Amino acid sequence: MDPKSQRVKFNDGHFIPVLGFGTYAPEEVPKSEALEATKFAIEVGFRHVDSAHLYQNEEQVGQAIRSKIADGTVKREDIFYTSKLWCNSLQPELVRPALEKSLQNLQLDYVDLYIIHSPVSLKPGNKFVPKDESGKLIFDSVDLCHTWEALEKCKDAGLTKSIGVSNFNHKQLEKILNKPGLKYKPVCNQVECHPYLNQSKLLEFCKSHDIVLVAYAALGAQLLSEWVNSNNPVLLEDPVLCAIAKKHKQTPALVALRYQVQRGVVVLAKSFNKKRIKENMQVFDFELTPEDMKAIDGLNRNTRYYDFQQGIGHPEYPFSEEY
């Protein structure tokens, strides 16, 4: 990590800010909140914004970015913006149109990072979550290597600066890395990662291949969305985390974010609350000791909040593997 600019270098030479602003919110949250929160995040210093076609807020997020460029707060090149290819567009011929649709919604010329949202391909069409009469997901069958080739073409066309994946296990990453004629390696793998699911083996694997691990749900998951397993314990109430926070006069959330930064993980902080958005920027103002890091490592219990159980049974369901 380059501490001065707080950025990490990708294997393709581009840089990603280590702290990102997450924009996912449950459907009942008005989209206008994404607009206001993203503007505020940029005002207080966030330079990395993470969204996705699935979140259905790219118009608002794009508007926020453009308004902060228009008022002189930032230039386009100061902002690192990530979008994601949703599961119903993994067929190679659907990849570029999906990215172009995101760009159209954003009203931007390019994204900085475009990633495959999940390896679980779903039936193409206008439904994000296509289901049959019995309510089961309708799967599609796609060779992810072919999807990857379509992403490589998007990079060559200048629609995205970098390309990566999300929710891939190490075997799925290996499949891409070992692909004959591979032009570009994935720059990152964005996965759920927090002290209860610290992904140490996947992190080690990614580091050995010069792939950056990006953490979502870094504070656990408070959202009662259809993707969340709600029987899990609340991460931010963990006594060890709370004790370390108290010692440093920080919040448990900041300790959880700082933990990732010190492991070389790029971390997304999702909040639409102005006080917390501002607070999350303080992750660079303190340092955890080696003892703190070891204690937090010891909290791992392989608890997955986003286990995407509807995807079980798909040949590419990623979470049956250990990592």
UniProtKB/Swiss-Prot annotation:
Native species: Bos taurus
Site (Lowers pKa of active site Tyr): 84
PANTHER family recorded: ALDO/KETO REDUCTASE
InterPro entries the record matches: AKR, AKR1C, Aldo/ket_reductase_CS, NADP_OxRdtase_dom, NADP_OxRdtase_dom_sf
Biological role stated in the UniProt entry: Catalyzes the reduction of PGD(2) and PGH(2) to PGF(2 alpha) and a stereoisomer, respectively. It has a broad substrate specificity and also reduces other carbonyl compounds.
Gene Ontology CC: cytosol
Binding site for NADP(+): 20-24, 50, 166-167, 190, 216-221, 270-280
Pfam families per record: Aldo_ket_red (PF00248)
Membrane-spanning parts: none
Stated name of the protein: Prostaglandin F synthase 2
Places the protein is found: Cytoplasm
Top-rank EC class of the record's enzyme: oxidoreductase
Reactions listed under catalytic activity: prostaglandin F2alpha + NADP(+) = prostaglandin D2 + NADPH + H(+)
GO aspect biological process, one term: steroid metabolic process
Pathway annotation from the record: Lipid metabolism; prostaglandin biosynthesis
MF annotations from Gene Ontology: aldose reductase (NADPH) activity; ketosteroid monooxygenase activity; prostaglandin F synthase activity; steroid dehydrogenase activity
Family per similarity comment: Belongs to the aldo/keto reductase family.
Annotated EC: 1.1.1.188
Binding-site residues, substrate: 117
Quaternary structure annotation from Swiss-Prot or TrEMBL: Monomer.
Keywords: Cytoplasm, Fatty acid biosynthesis, Fatty acid metabolism, Lipid biosynthesis, Lipid metabolism, NADP, Oxidoreductase, Prostaglandin biosynthesis, Prostaglandin metabolism
Active site: 55 (proton donor)
Upper classification of the organism: Eukaryota, Metazoa, Chordata, Craniata, Vertebrata
